[in-house]
Structures are given as C-alpha cells and as structure tokens.
Amino acid sequence: MNKITLLICALIVSISGLYAQAPTQASTQDSLLFEKNAHDYGTIVQGADGNCEFRFTNKGKSPLVLNNVHASCGCTIPEWPKEPIAPGKSSSIKVKYNTAIVGNFNKSITVNSNAVNNTVVLQIKGNVTPKQ
C-alpha cells in the first residue's frame, strides 16, 4: 500500500513540474501591427494596376525580422523588407496581383516573423472585368 501511495505522489510531483515552467517574456518580444489586414480592389479592368501596400509598425522592443512572406498562388507577388525593422519604426509589404486574369479573386498573403504574433494573414480581393 505504501509503495502505491509513494508512486502516486511521485507521479503528481512529476506532472506538476511540467506545468511549473517560467512564464514567457512576451512583453520583450517584437509585436507586428498592420494598419490594415485586407485590401479590396473593387471592380477593376483587365490589365489595371494590381499593386497595393500593407504598412506595418514594429511595436516591440527589439528588431523585427520578417522571415518569410508568401502568397496563396503565383498570381500574387509580395515584396517585403529583408533587413530588421527597428523598434517603433514602420515599413511595408508591397503586393502585386496579376490583373490579366479575369474574374473574382480572393487571395491570402502569409507573413512569418519573429514577433509574438509570428504569423499574420493578409487578404486581397476584387473582381477583374474584361477590357472592352
């Protein structure tokens, strides 16, 4: 009986040790804040300017690094700063949509960074009508 009690106590101590980890220091990590997370082109004509920009600010206390930015399809091309963004500074991700493709579109751009919110998904949408 004492062996079972000792075993149960050891198990409880082991499990509680797993949950006794030090809290993360989220306040000292970078925070990525976008002015907007979506852009609506509305209805545009085939071949029109498909460029838009997503401005963001590093709200953290250390340099922000955008590790990767990728679009949901090859018709959307993102450009992003490769150098670290200093605390309090702003920059932007430029997106070009291929407006040669006629029809409604709804695409996503996934931003991966070293921020607390390390994955942010941006959206673009619109409707491309044929040239007349």
Language model regions located:
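Short strand-edge motifs at loop-to-beta-strand transitions and within beta-strands
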Residues: 39, 89-95
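Short, hydrophobic/aromatic beta-strand segments
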Residues: 62-69, 121-123
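Short, solvent-exposed loop/linker segments at beta-strand-coil boundaries, enriched for Pro/Gly
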Residues: 72-79
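Asparagine-centered strand-capping/turn motif at beta-strand->loop junctions
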Residues: 56-60
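Bacterial Sec-dependent N-terminal signal peptides
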Residues: 1-24
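Beta-strand-rich interaction surfaces with strong enrichment in secreted/lumenal proteins
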Residues: 42, 80-85, 96-97
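Long, low-complexity ectodomains and other extracytoplasmic segments of secretory-pathway proteins
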Residues: 20-48, 55, 116-132
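Short, solvent-exposed loop/turn segments enriched in Ser/Thr/Gly
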Residues: 37, 47-53, 100-108
